[in-house]
């Protein structure tokens, strides 16, 4: 019998534990000066019951609390994601980032039933965009629009839900200028050669160190302005127009008028102002790649808090602009971070020309979202094999259910045959909920589903079909929550017009090749060799073009010394990987 514990008692204990827990936040950072993360007020927050890895806190997971909200969905979760700088095709390192955010949000929305307002910011004004437009002899605007469209087409191909709002730097110039003016009014800037620079020392070095300590290496995002800065950690808010640099591929200047003079926004200020345009001075969740943690996100925090409170104001120290930062781990290729600057990228479109979107989603699911992910043929082979394993299980279960429905000799199973699997299903549901509350631990969830499938296989012939249906339905529902398409039915390729047309053309090509061979070749050995080549090529083409696999078997008097299989895309991908690994 289950012992029920009152919700009030649980919540009371959680509050006591949390208060004890937060007294030691950031108290053991080996002498570093990373500032303390301030928990949202427990009296004015909704406790989701989820523990998360928050980059603002370095010593483990923290409770995920929705501030200014006493009841579930009293208000939606505010969430901002840094989008790409749209100057070239996105690669699978980007895809890992956005697909992982998609998975986490699907869990929150479809499993835990939270509402989210998701905003993504696109950088469509940047040095890289200007330089690329010069190479292609087009305007910076035309270039950025081209790659923005490609980016969102790629997201759709990957089954990644689009954000509720997309913000573009070019559409928020007025808001950015006003945002800088407010920071300037709060006495946190200085000007140098008509550029406006954020003064970290005036803001307070202890306040600044929200993600990284002051003694860690400072990396400037604009070497041209380095000589104009008072301190290496200072960063530019408004870049003065440079006629030698800020000209696009059509010869037009990329700049705007402002109270500070002609110029364009610095990189960090763009996100801060665009977030403020929708969410104002508070954000629940900010996500992005781990490479953006410093300096970009740390500078964002400083700007937003500097915008809300002036230098020396009494309540400045109590400010916490964003409560949670989720950083997605690097995608590693050949022991290096996948990066356009390193030139070691696989574009999303190149990947999808060979593999499915589901394959990439499986890769994301079996790795912890904030850990580095090593991309290799072995990783692909593992994930595709896992997907095939799940799809084959669904086919077996559905065939069993269909057979039971149509059988006239059905034997009624007793409940005793099903009780063990029923208990295993209940335990799996309980443990998977714990996994999802443990920082969205999808690798553990997948392992638990595999174990449940194994247990189901062992008792499939002795359990009630209603229970079998419920197990199948639960496994499918979890995969659907993750955004996986799990329809195990392979399309009837041999009845499609395309397949029939292909086979007809191949048959006629084969006839023509054999006729030419008979006419032109005189040596019997040469004829035999060429026929083998032609037939092998025909078999290879059938597999690659219409997923028809022909396998030879020893001739033992049968009229058909071969077998024929219609393959799904996953099998073809796996065969291709194995073939490449042998080369």
UniProtKB/Swiss-Prot annotation:
A Pfam short name: tRNA-synt_1e
Annotated GO biological process: cysteinyl-tRNA aminoacylation
Keyword NADP tagged: no
Keywords, sorted A to Z: Aminoacyl-tRNA synthetase, ATP-binding, Ligase, Metal-binding, Mitochondrion, Nucleotide-binding, Protein biosynthesis, Transit peptide, Zinc
The enzyme's E.C. designation: 6.1.1.16
Enzyme class per UniProt: ligase
Needed cofactors: Zn(2+)
Residues binding Zn(2+): 82, 271, 296, 300
Localization: Mitochondrion
Free-text cofactor note: Binds 1 zinc ion per subunit.
Residues engaged in binding ATP: 340
Binding site for L-cysteine: 83, 123, 296
Catalytic reactions on record: tRNA(Cys) + L-cysteine + ATP = L-cysteinyl-tRNA(Cys) + AMP + diphosphate
Sequence motif 'KIIK' region, residues: 128-131
GO molecular function: ATP binding; cysteine-tRNA ligase activity; metal ion binding
Ranges spanned by the short sequence motif 'KMSKS' region, renumbered to the chain: 337-341
Primary residence: mitochondrion
Motif residue range(s): 'HIGH' region: 84-94
Example of a GO cellular component annotation carried by this entry: cytoplasm
Functional note: Mitochondrial cysteine-specific aminoacyl-tRNA synthetase that catalyzes the ATP-dependent ligation of cysteine to tRNA(Cys).
Domain remark from Swiss-Prot or TrEMBL: 'KIIK' region and 'KMSKS' region are required for cysteine persulfide synthase activity.
Recorded family membership: Belongs to the class-I aminoacyl-tRNA synthetase family.
Name of the molecule in the record: Probable cysteine--tRNA ligase, mitochondrial
Organism this protein belongs to: Dictyostelium discoideum
């Amino acid at each position: 019998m289950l012992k029920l514990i009152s919700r009030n008692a649980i919540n009371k204990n959680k509050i006591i534990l949390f208060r004890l827990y937060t007294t030691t936040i950031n108290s053991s950072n080996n002498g570093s000066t990373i500032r303390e993360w301030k928990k949202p007020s427990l009296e004015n927050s909704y406790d989701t019951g989820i523990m998360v890895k928050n980059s603002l806190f370095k010593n483990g997971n923290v409770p995920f609390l929705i501030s200014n909200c006493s009841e579930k969905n009293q208000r939606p979760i505010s969430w901002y994601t840094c989008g790409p700088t749209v100057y070239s095709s996105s690669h699978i390192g980007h895809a890992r980032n956005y697909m992982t955010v998609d998975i986490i949000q699907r869990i929150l929305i479809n499993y835990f039933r939270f509402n989210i307002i998701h905003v993504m910011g696109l950088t469509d004004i940047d040095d890289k965009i200007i330089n690329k437009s010069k190479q292609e002899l087009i305007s910076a605007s035309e270039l950025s629009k081209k790659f923005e469209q490609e980016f969102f087409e790629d997201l759709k191909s990957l089954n990644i839900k689009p954000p509720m709002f997309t913000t573009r730097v070019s559409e928020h110039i007025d808001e950015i200028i006003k945002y800088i003016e407010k920071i300037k009014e709060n006495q946190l800037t200085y000007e140098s050669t008509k550029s406006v620079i954020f003064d970290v020392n005036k803001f307070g070095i202890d306040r600044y160190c929200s993600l990284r300590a002051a003694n860690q290496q400072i990396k400037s995002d604009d070497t041209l302005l380095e000589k104009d800065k008072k301190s290496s950690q200072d960063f530019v808010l408004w870049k003065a127009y440079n006629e030698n640099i800020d000209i696009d591929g059509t010869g037009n200047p990329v700049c705007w008028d402002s109270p500070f003079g002609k110029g364009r926004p610095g990189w960090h200020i763009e996100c801060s102002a665009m977030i403020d345009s929708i969410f104002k001075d508070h954000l629940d969740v900010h996500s992005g790649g781990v490479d953006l943690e410093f300096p970009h996100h740390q500078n964002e925090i400083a700007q937003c808090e500097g915008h809300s409170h002036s230098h020396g104001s009494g309540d400045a120290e109590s400010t916490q602009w964003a409560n949670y930062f989720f950083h997605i781990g690097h995608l590693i290729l050949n022991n290096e971070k996948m990066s356009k600057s390193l030139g070691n990228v696989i574009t999303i479109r190149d990947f999808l020309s060979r593999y499915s979107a589901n394959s990439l989603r499986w890769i994301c699911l079996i790795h912890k979202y904030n850990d580095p992910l090593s991309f290799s043929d072995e990783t692909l082979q593992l994930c595709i094999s896992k997907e095939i394993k799940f799809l084959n299980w669904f086919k077996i279960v559905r065939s069993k259910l269909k057979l039971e429905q149509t059988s006239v000799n059905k034997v009624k199973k007793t409940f005793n045959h099903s009780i063990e699997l029923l208990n295993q299903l209940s335990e799996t549901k309980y443990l998977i909920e714990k996994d999802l509350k443990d920082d969205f631990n999808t690798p553990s969830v997948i392992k638990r589903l595999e174990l449940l499938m194994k247990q189901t296989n062992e008792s499939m012939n002795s359990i009630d079909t209603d229970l079998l249906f419920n197990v199948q339905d639960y496994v499918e529902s979890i995969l659907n929550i993750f955004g996986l398409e799990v329809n195990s039915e392979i399309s009837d390729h041999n009845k499609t017009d395309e397949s029939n047309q292909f086979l007809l053309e191949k048959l006629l090509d084969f006839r023509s090749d054999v006729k030419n061979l008979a006419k032109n070749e005189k040596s019997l050995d040469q004829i035999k060799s060429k026929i083998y080549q032609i037939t092998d090529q025909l078999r290879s083409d059938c597999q690659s073009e219409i997923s028809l696999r022909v396998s030879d078997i020893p001739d033992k008097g049968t009229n058909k010394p071969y077998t024929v299989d219609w393959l799904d895309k996953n099998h073809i991908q796996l065969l291709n990987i194995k073939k490449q690994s042998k080369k």
